[in-house]
Amino acid sequence: MSGFAKLKSWLYKASLFVSLILLIGFSVVLPIDSIAQASKSENNAFNTFIVVGALVVFGVFCIFIIIGRMLFHKSCLKDIPRRYIPITPADLPHRSSREAVLQNMERSKELTILLKKPKDPVIHDGLEPPRRCDYPLDEKLFPEYLNYADCIKSLTDRLKYHGLFLNNLDVRMNLEDTFADVVNSQFVNHNANKIQLEKAKEFIDLYETIRFSGKDVTRDQFIKFVKFCLYFGEVSLTRDTSFANLHNFRLNGSSNNIGRTESKYSINPFDENEYAQDDMHYFPEPPTHLVRESSISTVARHVSSGVDLTNSEEHPLDTDSDCNALRLKLSKADSYRSVIRH
């Protein structure tokens, strides 16, 4: 600020101070003189009432003006954008203050760039971290910001509302059965495999710890839980219960070729041929059973009501003549261009 500008500022402040002193002095003299003159008059009570009433009206009027000015000033401040920073001389005449504002803005920019990527990995329990906060050498197994607890809860929701446990539709359970009861009935009861028994107990303990401990799920717990699900899912797929009633039929090598022609259906839910992709939109979610392939032949035959294989009292098929007889029965049965959904 130049010398002439400083002189103007000092003259303005001095004149304002003198004017305020004179205004206050004359304002104080007037009510005092009015009260003194009223007290000397003959009608003291009436004159005093008039003077005091005038002073009260004047005071109320002054208060009204001051409050109105404050409200007007506040409304003017609201019109200023909140993100506006006063960096111009008209907004902030003090030069040092403007320079401090500009320096802090530059520092904030540097800190933003510096802290955008943390120095060390930041991993919080319960949520999959983004790639920029994760360990750079670890393989990214799950999507970013995946909620571990929601994924685990969906397993019990599918069991509770859909009767589906690890993609196994053959779940015999009661309404009061818990997750542990289902695991015990599927993999513990009547099971002599020590490895499966041990893993089933660990699976139950891990699930109950995650669901009822009240703590966030760690990444290690979630990875271990997913491994257990994959393991027991594979174990469930090896248990084919659809032909349990036909265990008495021991087919030899020639009879195994019955009905094994190239089919237009596949049990691979991730089949990527054009026919499978065309039919995928019919399913609300990836199918867990059979998907069409490119062939137009039949993969299975529907046995009519006249042919009862499950309750057959015949002896097991050991000779070629028995196999030929069975093939003749199947050829006379009704045929469908469909599959048996397991």
Curated annotation (Swiss-Prot):
Cite the ranges annotated as topological domain Extracellular.
37-47
Which domain of life does this protein belong to? Eukaryota
Localization, per the record, is: Membrane
Topology with respect to the bilayer = Multi-pass membrane protein
List residues in topological domain: Cytoplasmic: 1-15, 69-342
Entry keywords, A to Z: Membrane, Transmembrane, Transmembrane helix
Q: What is one cellular component GO term in this UniProt entry?
A: membrane
Where does it primarily localize?
membrane
Q: Does the keyword Ribosomal protein apply?
A: no
The phenotype of cells or organisms lacking this gene is: Sensitivity to 6-azauracil (6AU) and mycophenolic acid (MPA).
Mark the transmembrane ranges: 16-36, 48-68
What is the stated purpose of this protein?
Required for growth under high-pressure and low-temperature conditions.
Misc note = Present with 1200 molecules/cell in log phase SD medium.
Family per similarity comment: Belongs to the DLT1 family.
- This protein is called Defect at low temperature protein 1
Q: Which organism is it from?
A: Saccharomyces cerevisiae (strain ATCC 204508 / S288c) (Baker's yeast)
